[in-house]
Amino acid sequence: GMMLADHGARVIRVARQGSRDAAGRDVLSRNRERIEADLKSPEGIAAVRELAKTADGIIEGFRPGVMERLGLGPDVLLGDNPKLVYGRMTGWGQYGPLSQAAGHDINYISISGNLHGYGRPNEKPTPPTNAIGDFAGGGMMLSFGMVAGILNARSTGKGQVIDCAMTDGAAVIHAMQWGFRGMGAWEDTRGVNMLDTAAHFYDTYECADGTFISIGSIEPQFYALLREKAGLTDPAFDAQMDKSAWPSL
């Protein structure tokens, strides 16, 4: 919702009746309106259905089957509003053996294979906070799908369901690595590839004051500038792309 609201959409959050409003403290709630509804009551269900009748889209994040049991599933709401784009966000997808399982970002990026690529050589994988599953593979993928669905509905008059699973999104985020592996340009070991800290010109280094600096000098002109500024005059640094020399450099 934050991404859509930030780009000008009118976003209304349907909150549980009596719940605390975190909009003033939660950055993810910015630019969103808020209403309360008791989804266990006929009145609450009717209120949501009425709201959806004039909406471009709706987003829900319950476990699979919950919205259907509430009487707010896609068949019902698209019956009320055929142009509605119905967004669904789950960890594992609507179907399959894990669809009803609980999970967090770390679980989704593990199953997708994404987590395998993060970390130093000969060490365990290091989760990159919850940026990959929850936000990149989840929220951003769904917001893109919602925009695409709404644009399609405006030209065709037909709504649709956007089924977004964080596991699927996390796998897509790593598409470049999967492609490189298929081409033989990426090794299936952490910390031995150019973009995962193996290369001396693409890594982080501790400074004298205890802070850290990131270096990303892939292109020849930037690598030459790095050598000039860092005083790397040893001829050994000439062979920038010689992977066999990276560990010693």
Predicted regions and their residues:
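N-terminal helix-loop segment corresponding to the beta1-alpha1 unit
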Residues: 1-155
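Short Pro/Gly-enriched beta-strand edge/turn motifs at strand-loop
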Residues: 12-14, 183-190
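A short, charged, Gly/Pro-tolerant segment at domain boundaries
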Residues: 164-172
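Short acidic/polar mixed-charge low-complexity motifs
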Residues: 33, 158, 209-211
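Aromatic-enriched alpha-helical interface/lid elements that frame and gate functional surfaces
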Residues: 196, 200-249
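Conserved beta-loop-beta element that borders a ligand/cofactor-binding pocket
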Residues: 88-90, 160-165
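Oxidoreductase and adenylate-handling cofactor-binding alpha/beta cores
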Residues: 112, 138-160, 172-185, 225-233
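A short glycine-threonine-serine/GTX helix/turn-capping micro-motif
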Residues: 126-137, 159-161, 192-196, 200-202, ...
